[in-house]
Amino acid sequence: MAPAASELKLGKKVNEGKTKEVYELPDIPGCVLMQSKDQITAGNAARKDRMEGKAAISNTTTSCVFQLLQEAGIKTAFVRKQSDTAFIAAHCEMIPIEWVCRRIATGSFLKRNPGVKEGYKFYPPKIEMFYKDDANNDPQWSEEQLIEAKFSFAGLTIGKTEVDIMARSTQAIFEILEKSWQPQNCTLVDLKIEFGVNILTKEIVLADVIDNDSWRLWPSGDRSQQKDKQSYRDLKEVTPEALQMVKRNFEWVAERVELLLKTKSQGRVVVLMGSTSDLGHCEKIKKACATFGIPCELRVTSAHKGPDETLRIKAEYEGDGIPTVFVAVAGRSNGLGPVMSGNTAYPVVNCPPLSSDWGAQDVWSSLRLPSGLGCPTTLSPEGAAQFAAQIFGLNNHLVWAKLRSNMLNTWISLKQADKKLRECTL
């Protein structure tokens, strides 16, 4: 069990950067303490000022962002917020690359790409990488340069597979945060992140911090309202009044970033089964819904034997105003799905539990339907839950984040399996 905050013992200082210090934690093997500073910098510390309260503001922002990503399913080094100004993270050997993902062309991109106008939008987002070298102003690197560097961290050699994983992860992380800021009417313009190799698990994880130094954030998509560190970079002269303006911007972001962990959007799945003999199949749907954070209710009703009760149950859920996806589970002769689809404007999906003997025939009661009915069919309980999640994800960034993370993790697992197989056959 981790020690209480008052008992936390600090070991040696592992690293110190412009805005934070990293300490070993002897009582928590494999973890470090990330301690923020009340300091703000720009231009590789060419401009540097003390900003009272920045450590707490940055720690709040980072902790909320990492919690959001971790709950979505992104692998991060974040463990927990330890104090107002520090958090505990897995000890990683850091990969000295800053990964940048851009939706809108601005800043240094315009200087490096003459002729591109500010505001140009990238579809998909633009991925760039920069080697961390203060003496040379963090030069931009290509994928080939990173591969040929043959870096090794915590025993993991950074090759083509690892570079691809970091690039793919950077895009997914950006898109999750971009989607999360949209309900706050804020445009995430670009994002800078770093990865490390966990010294215990030997896997690449999102590490370091993501705070208001890490992105450009434009309320209402308006650059003149920028709330990020660019407001500090743009100062012609740093005065106490100007620094207070910058601090207010940082506080504005820290207050709103906590809202990213919540959603005003409601939603639920209601599984209708024709018989309790199908309960096991329905429980799988409910379990899969839980992985997306979607409430799921199970009901028993037969559209053949009690159509009046089926329609009464339908009206019950239509009447409370909560967005609902109905899943019809009936195998032998699916009346539930078609009857529900023909009598509600809510989405209905069929998920019949087909038997091995008559399944090939029974499935047609879910597939061949009269005109005016729109209930798709999936045989997978997990597929039915995912179908519902994709509907709710249109208006719920937390559900969407889990879907996007699942896509990334599936891609990574295939990439790693391919690498392992190739290594075994060489």
Swiss-Prot record:
CDD domains: SAICAR_synt_Ade5 (cd01416). One of its GO terms (biological process) is 'de novo' IMP biosynthetic process. GO terms for molecular function: ATP binding; phosphoribosylaminoimidazole carboxylase activity; phosphoribosylaminoimidazolesuccinocarboxamide synthase activity. SUPFAM superfamilies: N5-CAIR mutase (phosphoribosylaminoimidazole carboxylase, PurE), SAICAR synthase-like. Pathway: Purine metabolism; IMP biosynthesis via de novo pathway; 5-amino-1-(5-phospho-D-ribosyl)imidazole-4-carboxamide from 5-amino-1-(5-phospho-D-ribosyl)imidazole-4-carboxylate: step 1/2; Purine metabolism; IMP biosynthesis via de novo pathway; 5-amino-1-(5-phospho-D-ribosyl)imidazole-4-carboxylate from 5-amino-1-(5-phospho-D-ribosyl)imidazole (carboxylase route): step 1/1. Pfam families: AIRC, SAICAR_synt. Signal peptide: none annotated. It catalyses: 5-amino-1-(5-phospho-D-ribosyl)imidazole-4-carboxylate + L-aspartate + ATP = (2S)-2-[5-amino-1-(5-phospho-beta-D-ribosyl)imidazole-4-carboxamido]succinate + ADP + phosphate + 2 H(+); 5-amino-1-(5-phospho-D-ribosyl)imidazole-4-carboxylate + H(+) = 5-amino-1-(5-phospho-beta-D-ribosyl)imidazole + CO2. GO terms for cellular component: cytosol. Its EC number is 6.3.2.6, 4.1.1.21. Keywords: ATP-binding, Decarboxylase, Ligase, Lyase, Multifunctional enzyme, Nucleotide-binding, Purine biosynthesis. Residues 1-261 are annotated as: SAICAR synthetase. Residues 262-426 are annotated as: AIR carboxylase. Gene3D superfamilies: 3.40.50.1970, ATP-grasp fold, B domain, Phosphorylase Kinase, domain 1. In the N-terminal section; belongs to the SAICAR synthetase family. In the C-terminal section; belongs to the AIR carboxylase family. Class II subfamily. Homooctamer. HAMAP family: PurE_classII, SAICAR_synth. NCBIfam families: purE. This is Multifunctional protein ADE2.
